[in-house]
């Protein structure tokens, strides 16, 4: 699922994302591709975290 919502990232998470983008670019990926890939990974991680949180809440009922 593609979600255009802005994610709220801590400073540390932002730094990690920047570093990953830089590594991908050093390996030859364009900046646009690197940013898109890291953003996709962040969205997927956020979605998985949200799903796990909802499962936990359901189990507590």
From Swiss-Prot:
Q: Which InterPro entries match?
A: UPF0181
Pfam families (alphabetical): UPF0181
Report what the protein is called: UPF0181 protein MS1074
Q: Which family does it belong to?
A: Belongs to the UPF0181 family.
In terms of superkingdom, the source organism counts as Bacteria
Organism name: Mannheimia succiniciproducens (strain KCTC 0769BP / MBEL55E)
Identify the NCBIfam families for this entry: PRK05114.1
């Amino acid at each position: 699922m593609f979600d255009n919502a802005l994610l709220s990232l801590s400073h540390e998470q932002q730094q990690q994302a920047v570093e990953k983008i830089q590594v991908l670019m050093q390996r030859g990926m364009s900046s646009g591709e690197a940013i898109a890939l890291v953003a996709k990974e962040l969205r997927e991680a956020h979605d998985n975290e949200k799903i796990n949180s909802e499962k936990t809440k359901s189990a507590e009922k």
